[in-house]
Amino acid sequence: MVRSKFKDEHPFDKRKAEAERIRQKYQDRIPVICEKAEKSDIPTIDKKKYLVPADLTVGQFVYVIRKRIKLAPEKAIFIFVDDILPPTAALMSSIYDEHKDEDGFLYVLYASENTFGDLEQYAISE
């Protein structure tokens, strides 16, 4: 698991208290920390913390990230939660329930390539 810069910069107790406060105040939203994967050549996002509607899909969240980093349409982007590529159609609430951190935030990494898996296994040979 890749270490989050947000975790390094903020003590556990403060992160946990903030996530609890957010969840109490906005029960239909999910607290997400979105960070760029370290060795990715993709632009850095301008803000890390997001309050995401529970019924937003992973694909819709990827669209939000693309817009925030002003990524060209022809450029690929992948997001990872706990080093896995979540299904595009999955609801963020499901991903949160399965992968939220002990501090109450969902940590998402984004990259310009699939850095955690080998896409070659899915290649179609002619």
UniProtKB/Swiss-Prot annotation:
Sites of Phosphatidylethanolamine amidated glycine lipidation: 117
Predominant location: membrane
The protein, known as: Autophagy-related protein 8
UniProt site (Cleavage): 117-118
Membrane topology: Lipid-anchor
Taxonomic lineage of the native organism: Eukaryota, Fungi, Dikarya, Basidiomycota, Agaricomycotina
Disulfide linkage: none
GO CC, alphabetical: autophagosome membrane; cytoplasmic vesicle; fungal-type vacuole membrane
Organism field: Cryptococcus neoformans var. neoformans serotype D (strain JEC21 / ATCC MYA-565)
Modification(s) after translation: The C-terminal 9 residues are removed to expose Gly-117 at the C-terminus. The C-terminal Gly is then amidated with phosphatidylethanolamine by an activating system similar to that for ubiquitin.
